[in-house]
Amino acid sequence: MAAERYNPRVAEAHWQKVWEENRTFETDNSDSREKYYVLEMFPYPSGRIHMGHVRNYAMGDVVARYKRAKGFNVLHPMGWDAFGMPAENAAMQNKVHPKEWTYQNIATMKRQLKSMGLSLDWSREFATCDVEYYHRQQMLFIDLYEKGLVTRKTSKVNWDPVDNTVLANEQVVDGRGWRSGALVEQRELTQWFFKITDFSEELLAGLDTLDQWPEKVRLMQRNWIGKSEGLQVRFALAAGTAPAGFSEVEVYTTRPDTLFGAAFVAISADHPLAKKLSEGNAALSSFIEECHQQGTSLAALETAEKKGFDTGIKVKHPFDDNWELPVYVANFVLMEYGTGAVFGCPAHDQRDLDFANKYKLKVTPVVLPKGEDAASFSIGETAYTDDGVMINSRFLDGMTPEAAFNEVASRLEKTDLVGRPQAVRKVQFRLRDWGISRQRYWGCPIPMIHCESCGVNPVPRADLPVKLPDDVEFDRPGNPLDRHATWRHVKCPKCGGDARRETDTMDTFVDSSWYYTRFTAPWENEPTDRKAADHWLPVDQYIGGIEHAILHLLYSRFFTRAMKVAGHVGVDEPFKGLFTQGMVVHETYKANGQWVSPADIRIEEIDGKRVATMLDSGAPVEIGSIEKMSKSKKNVVDPDDIIASYGADTARWFVLSDSPPERDVIWTEAGAEGAHRFVQRIWRLVAEAAPALKDVAPKAGTQGEALGVSKAAHKAVKAVGDDIEKLAFNRGVARLYELVNTLSGALQQAADGKADAEMKGALREATEMLVLMTAPMMPHLAEQCLAELGGKVAGKETLVARAPWPVFDPALVVENEIVLPVQINGKKRGDLTIARDADQASIQQAVLELDFVKAALNGGSPKKIIVVPQRIVNVVA
C-alpha cells in the first residue's frame, strides 16, 4: 500500500513542539556525563537569517545531536551579538529606536532558527544588549582595570569619517572601515585600551597548542601578532644638519645584515624630530597633515602610495663616519611601531625600492642570489628578498645573511656612542593594544567617571549597571550620549562633587569576546560561575567564518587570559576545536542591466543551453557568475521560502550534502528539489515497509540477502560516525544515499509481504540504524519515521533526539573478501577476488586459474609467484 506523501510543514511543527514541551535540549550543569560544548558564532540580529546561517547552524546541530547520541552531556546554546552600528543607522533612517529595532529582529530571527529544528538550549539565551549581560561586562571591565589590564592614553587612532567613530587596526581592511568602506583617517584622541600586548608572547606560543584549528587561521594570527627579532641601532646626526637638542635617530631593523645597502632613513610624521623640523616649515607641515589623512593600521600604510619629504638632515652610517644618509619624513612609518624610524635598503625590500626609485636614491645590492655573478648582478624593478651571500658589505662579504646579522649586532653592541652601545638586540611585536572606545550610543557603556579633582575612577560596583538612556535623538551623526541633557552628569564617587560619565561605549567585539563563557551559567550574578566555566571550557567545537580569524578569535583568546588573571576562568584558550565553513553562493542574474532575484526568473534548457527569462514579462535575463549571496546583487534565497516549500530538513540536507563543508556550496533550485526527493524517498520506503516491520525485533542477518542488508547498515554506522567526527558531513550524506539505495529493494520486498523472518529482523535493525543516522541531518524526518515504526529503538520507546547512536558489530564491518592486483612480470594485468584469510598456496592456485594468467603462460609454468599479503601478486613468467 502506497504511503501518504510526507508533509514537512505538519511534521516539523509537531516535532518542534514535542522537543520544546519535553525540554529535550536543555542542559543540566550537574549532569555527570562527559561534557561536550559545541557553539556556532552567534548572529548579529540584522533582520532575517540567510542561507549562510542555515549552513553554519546545521553543521553545529549535526555535531550536537551526534555527540548527544554518543552519550555526552552537550551544551549547545544560542544568543545574539546585538550591539552595533546598523541599529543606529536604522534609527536615523527609519526613526525607530535601536532597542526596538534590535529586539524586533531578534524575535523574527529566533522564529526562523526555531523553524530549522536546531537542538538548542534556548533557556540560556541572551542578547549582548540585555542590561543583564552588559552589567556583567561592566563588572569585568572594572575587574580588568583593577588588574592593570585596562589603560587610558592619547594615541593616533583610525577615524571612520562616515560612521563617525574610532576603529581598531583589525577593523581597517585595505585602508577602509570594515563596515562603512570609507577611507580611514588618523586622529589623535584619548582612548580606553585593553592591554592585549601584555599577552603577545603568550598568544603567539598558545597557537602551537591549537592543533584542532585550521593552519591558515593560526598563520594569520601569527602574522598579526608579528613577533620579530631585530636590532635597535642609533644613527648619529651629521654635524651642522641637526636642530638643537637632537643628536641621533634610533632605528629598529630586522635586517641589520643589509646596512651596507642603506640609502636613506625614514621617520614617522609624528616623530619628535619631524615635529621639531615642521616648526616654521609650511611645506613639511602640509606633508605631515597629508600623512594624518590615512589610517594608522599597517594595512592602510601598505595600500597608500609611498611618499616622503626630504628634511635636509643627514645621519652617519654606523660603520663609516664619512658616509651620510638622507633623512625623510615618510608616510609609511608609524610612531607606534618600533621606534618610529627605519632605514631603507632598496635592493632587498620592495617598499624601499619603490621609494628609492621615486626619489632617485642609490640602489646597492648586498645579498647575492646563489649562482649569480657579483660583478654583473643588479636590481631591476623587483627587490631581491631571498637568501644568498653578502656582497658590497666590506667585512661581511661572503657571509650568509644570518651570520652577517650576528656580526653586525656583535660589533655595534660593543661600539660606544655617547656613553651607550650603538645597538641593542630587541624583540618587537606588530600587535598593538586594543583600543575599545567607540563614539556610539548602541554599545556597552564604559563604567568610568571623570572628576576634575579626583581624576578618572570606576563606577562603584553597587551603582552598576550603567544603563543606556532610552530618551536619545538620532537626528545627526555623532554620539547621542555626548548630547544627552542629564545622563552624562553624575556625582564623583570619591569627593561627591560634580563629575561626568564616560560617554564612549565599548567596541562591540568586547561583547563577543566572552559570551561563550557567559553561556556556561547565564543566570549568575557574577560574570561567571567559576565551577561551571571551568567545567565547560574550552568550547570543544567552535564553528564560524574565516573572516573572524583575527578580530573575534584573537580578542577571545586575549579575553580568556585576562579573565583568568581576574579569577573568572581557569583556562587559557577559549576554543579547543575551530572549524571555518565555506559560504553559500548563488548565480547572479541581470535584466536590462539591473540585478534580479532568482525568485523572479524562470530557467529552461533550450537546445542544450540554460536560458533565463523574467517570470512576469518573459524578457531575457543574463545568467552571470556565481557569487556570495548578497542583497545588493539580489542573488539571495530566503530560508523561510525554502522551508515553506520543501521543509527544514531539505534545506539542512542540501547545505550539508553538496560540497565539503570548508568549501563554498552553490545553492540551486535543482539541488534543493533533489534533496527534497530524497526526503520523500526515505519516507516512502520506511512508511510502506513499517506495517511489516513495526512489531519485529531488530536482529542482524546471518546469511544470504539478510546478511548483506546487515553488513551494509553496520558499515554505514561506522563510516557515518567517523565522517561526523571529522566534520566531513558531505561524505556522511553520500554514505546515507548509498545505504538507502542498498536497502530500497529489500524494504520494497517487506512492503510487498515477501520478506522472510530473518530478512525482517535484519531490515528492522537496518531501518532503525538508517533513521538514527539521518537524525543529526534531518531530525524531523527521523522522528516521523521512528514513530511510523512504533516509536521504539531496540525495543525501547524513545524519541530519536534521546536515542543512542547505533552500535556496529565489528564482525559485520570487516570485508571477508579482498581484491588483489595481479601483475605479470611487473605489469598489472588484472585482479583477483579472494577470501581475506586465504593462505599463500590458495592465492597462488587461484592466480593460475585466471584466464589472463593462463594466456600469458601459454601452457607453461611460471618461474615464480610472489604474494605480498593483503597487497599484490606478481607472476614471473
Swiss-Prot record:
One of its GO terms (biological process) is leucyl-tRNA aminoacylation. PROSITE patterns: AA_TRNA_LIGASE_I. Belongs to the class-I aminoacyl-tRNA synthetase family. The keyword Aminoacyl-tRNA synthetase applies. This is Leucine--tRNA ligase. It is found in: Cytoplasm. The gene is leuS. CDD domains: Anticodon_Ia_Leu_BEm (cd07958), LeuRS_core (cd00812). A motif ('KMSKS' region) lies at residues 628-632. Gene3D superfamilies: 2.20.28.290, 3.10.20.590, HUPs, Isoleucyl-tRNA Synthetase, Domain 1, Valyl/Leucyl/Isoleucyl-tRNA synthetase, editing domain. ATP binds at K631. One of its GO terms (cellular component) is cytosol. One of its GO terms (molecular function) is leucine-tRNA ligase activity. Keywords: Aminoacyl-tRNA synthetase, ATP-binding, Cytoplasm, Ligase, Nucleotide-binding, Protein biosynthesis. Its EC number is 6.1.1.4. A motif ('HIGH' region) lies at residues 43-53. It is an enzyme of class 6 (ligase). InterPro entries: aa-tRNA-synth_I_CS, aa-tRNA-synth_Ia, Leu-tRNA-ligase, Leu_tRNA-synth_edit, M/V/L/I-tRNA-synth_anticd-bd, Methionyl/Leucyl_tRNA_Synth, Rossmann-like_a/b/a_fold, tRNAsynth_Ia_anticodon-bd. Pfam families: Anticodon_1, tRNA-synt_1, tRNA-synt_1_2, tRNA-synt_1g. It comes from Brucella ovis (strain ATCC 25840 / 63/290 / NCTC 10512). NCBIfam families: leuS_bact (TIGR00396). The keyword Transcription regulation does not apply. Coiled coil: none annotated. It catalyses: tRNA(Leu) + L-leucine + ATP = L-leucyl-tRNA(Leu) + AMP + diphosphate.
